[in-house]
From Swiss-Prot:
Compartmental location: Cytoplasm; Cell inner membrane
Gene3D superfamilies recorded: HflD-like
Species in which this protein is naturally found: Shewanella woodyi (strain ATCC 51908 / MS32)
A UniProt-annotated Pfam family: DUF489
Name of this chain's protein: High frequency lysogenization protein HflD homolog
Family, per entry: Belongs to the HflD family.
Membrane topology: Peripheral membrane protein
A cellular component annotation (GO) from this entry: plasma membrane
Coarse class of the protein's main subcellular location: cytoplasm
UniProt keyword annotations, A-Z: Cell inner membrane, Cell membrane, Cytoplasm, Membrane
Length: 204
C-alpha cells in the first residue's frame, strides 16, 4: 500500500506541477522551458512500466510536491485558484474516463510523437498541437476551466496555447492518479500520509 501511495502522490504532484505553471503563465506571460518540457513529456508516456517513468524530470516534479505541502498542509496560505483548477481537471477526467474519447486522445498523441522527429517539445508548433488536443478532445467534455490572470497576457495566442497544453498535461497526470486508485476523499482521509510523502520527496 505504501508503494502505491507513493506512486499516487507522485501522479498528484504531476497534476499540481502543471496547474502551477498554468497559474504562472496566466499571471506573468512567460514560462520556464525546463518545467514546461517536463510537464509536456508526461503526455507522451502512454504505456509506462512504472509511475516513475512518466516523471523523468524529478527536479521539476518538486514544484508539484511543494504545492501539495502548501495546499494540504496546515498553512493558512492555501491558494483557492490552484484548488479551483484542480477541481476542474478532476471533473473533466471523470468524464474522459467514462466516455469514449480515450481512443481519439491516443491517436492525437501519436501525431505529436511523429511531429517530434522534426521539432523539440517546446516548439510553438508542438505546443499548438497539444493545445489543439485539449480543445478538441478534453475541453468539449464539460464546463470550461476559467483561467484567471493578466488580461494582456491571456489574450495572446501563444499564452493561450501553453495554458491549454499544460491543462492537457494536468489531465494526463489526473488519469494516472485515478488509474492508481486516486479518489478525492483520499485528499481528506489520507492527507497526513500524502503530506509525509511529499515532504520526504522534497528532501531526496
Amino acid at each position: 500500500m505504501s508503494e502505491l501511495l507513493d506512486e499516487r502522490t507522485m501522479a498528484f504532484a504531476g497534476i499540481l506541477q502543471a496547474i502551477g505553471q498554468v497559474q504562472h503563465i496566466a499571471r506573468h506571460g512567460n514560462s520556464d522551458n525546463d518545467s514546461l518540457a517536463a510537464s509536456l513529456n508526461t503526455v507522451l508516456v502512454t504505456n509506462p512500466d512504472s509511475t516513475s517513468d512518466v516523471y523523468a524530470d524529478k527536479t521539476a516534479l518538486n514544484k508539484g510536491y511543494q504545492l501539495i505541502v502548501n495546499q494540504l498542509g496546515d498553512s493558512k496560505d492555501k491558494d483557492v485558484e490552484i484548488t479551483r483548477y484542480l477541481v476542474g481537471i478532476l471533473a473533466l477526467e471523470r468524464k474522459l474516463s467514462r466516455g469514449n474519447a480515450m481512443g481519439l486522445l491516443a491517436e492525437r498523441i501519436n501525431q505529436v510523437h511523429r511531429q517530434l522527429h522534426h521539432f523539440s517539445i517546446t516548439d510553438e508548433q508542438v505546443i499548438a498541437n497539444f493545445a489543439g488536443i485539449y480543445s478538441d478532445v478534453i475541453s468539449t467534455l464539460g464546463p470550461k476551466i476559467q483561467i484567471s490572470g493578466n488580461p494582456e497576457f491571456l489574450k495572446q495566442n501563444q499564452v493561450q496555447e501553453k495554458i491549454r497544453a499544460l491543462l492537457l498535461s494536468a489531465m494526463r497526470s489526473a488519469v494516472l492518479w485515478r488509474q492508481l486508485g486516486g479518489k478525492r476523499r483520499h485528499l481528506v482521509f489520507a492527507r497526513k500520509s500524502i503530506l509525509d510523502i511529499a515532504n520526504k520527496s522534497l528532501t531526496l
